[in-house]
């Protein structure tokens, strides 16, 4: 296949993926490698939006959040995603990729607010859009934000980048007999109790008939192979 399989995609990155082998924070070499993968896909003409988590930063302050009100802790997590989004966008700009960070909570001196028509305009102009601050509401994960934004922008697929190269029948780190699914339906994943995304995000994707591709961001070239429609990771579909 010489042309990409998708025109517009939503890439979900976990904050933990930015840590590399560090205990928390942002590993510079890791983020530069991710940006190289992202820029390669962008240059193929694929319209790319990104939702990133905040676990790598929140992990460093988590002990101090014990006993904290859940909503307050969630807002702290949203701010962590803004920091990650700024770091990612800055790294992209340094390699000549135009990126725009749009936040679900107002921090107008730092990033612009999320406005759907503006996000669509940026994508059509070939810019990468990084959605920060989750959904802007506590009690919702960044997985749910990825499903929501993916549906809003009309993405053809949600690409969930993890440290594991797909969905397995069991934990491959614990069960040597665990097998990777190449494709699986939403209903099969539910019946087999496979953890693909949190329940809210998973239900939203299923209801909107928005497929999910789970793949390893650690594998070199995996993102490009996914976008080109090659057999990489696990496709979850209706």
UniProtKB/Swiss-Prot annotation:
Top-level taxon of the source organism: Bacteria
Keyword NADP: no
Annotated Gene Ontology cellular component terms: cytosol
Alphabetical UniProt keywords: ATP-binding, Cytoplasm, Kinase, Nucleotide-binding, Pyrimidine biosynthesis, Transferase
GO molecular function annotation: ATP binding; UMP kinase activity
Pathway(s) served: Pyrimidine metabolism; CTP biosynthesis via de novo pathway; UDP from UMP (UMPK route): step 1/1
Residues engaged in binding ATP: 12-15, 55, 59, 162, 168, 171
Enzyme class label: transferase
EC number: 2.7.4.22
Reactions catalysed: UMP + ATP = UDP + ADP
Keyword Kinase attached: yes
Matching InterPro entries: AceGlu_kinase-like_sf, Asp/Glu/Uridylate_kinase, Uridylate_kinase, Uridylate_kinase_bac
Locations listed in the record: Cytoplasm
CDD domains tied to this protein: AAK_UMPK-PyrH-Ec
Function: Catalyzes the reversible phosphorylation of UMP to UDP.
Family label: Belongs to the UMP kinase family.
Protein name: Uridylate kinase
Gene coding for it: pyrH
